[in-house]
């Protein structure tokens, strides 16, 4: 989500909340708008990446109550590969430490992984396969067509000590074979909501001039062929994914506000 092409502002966050959106996750642009940063403690439905420094404002994950009364955990993660406005801690180390805490509260865990690197998001998917309900990639602004259900892979060589998970808090041992029955929904990038005929929401003409001349040009917004993109994920009663389906809804031109 962006306000004026640079991070989400407080007013737009509140507007989205009133429209019925339960949770907003933020990537490396989460601290771009001062009014949102100052009010993050009062806006718990807006999440900043969980692998930021300990004293960062806001929360990196939160529990929500579903319509059927179940508890759902949403986690925001920021990658480290490529160009990012924020310097995050290692997301793999963070998730390894955080998951046992969340799992004691609920098996329903959905994570948003904001990264510009496809390989980083795919690697995280294999790392978390069978351990969370869904991993939804974001950050590139372009939807991918690789949605799938993933499960943990067993090491059949007999030397797979890394595939045995020991919870010291509950004194339970879980092998990856037990995790195989649980599926994780995954997509490398769910896309964006905005102009489909654009360069990441920016007018193509300006971006063409920028690439041809090498001179930065402040991006101009465009409202051509506005679409809502995302994924529809169905979970079972144990926190596993049953299905994941890409969503793209084109908004009629008459319903789209035009820039002044």
Residues of each region from the PLM?
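Acidic, metal/ion-coordinating pockets
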Residues: 1-260
């Amino acid at each position: 989500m962006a306000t004026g092409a640079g991070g989400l502002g407080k007013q737009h966050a509140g507007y989205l909340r009133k429209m019925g959106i339960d949770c907003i996750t933020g990537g490396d642009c989460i601290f771009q708008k001062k009014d949102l940063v100052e009010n993050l403690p009062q806006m718990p439905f807006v999440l900043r990446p969980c692998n930021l420094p300990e004293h960062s404002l806001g929360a990196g994950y939160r529990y929500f109550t579903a319509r059927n009364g179940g508890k759902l955990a949403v986690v925001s993660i920021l990658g480290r590969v490529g160009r990012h406005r924020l310097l995050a801690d290692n997301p793999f180390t963070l998730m390894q430490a955080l998951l046992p805490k969340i799992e004691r509260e609920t098996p329903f865990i959905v994570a948003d992984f904001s990264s510009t690197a496809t390989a980083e998001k795919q690697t995280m998917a294999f790392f978390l396969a069978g351990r969370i309900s869904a991993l939804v990639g974001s950050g590139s602004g372009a939807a991918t067509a690789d949605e799938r259900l993933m499960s943990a892979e067993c090491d059949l060589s007999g030397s797979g000590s890394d595939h045995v998970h020991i919870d010291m808090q509950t004194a339970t041992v879980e092998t990856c074979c037990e995790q195989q029955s649980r599926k994780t929904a995954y997509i490398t990038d769910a896309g964006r909501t905005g102009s489909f005929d654009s360069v990441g929401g920016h007018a193509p003409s300006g971006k063409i001039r920028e690439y041809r001349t090498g001179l930065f040009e402040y991006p101009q917004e465009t409202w051509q062929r506005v679409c809502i993109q995302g994924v529809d994920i169905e979970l079972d009663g144990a926190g596993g994914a049953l299905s994941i389906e890409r969503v793209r809804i084109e908004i009629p031109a008459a319903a789209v506000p035009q820039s002044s």
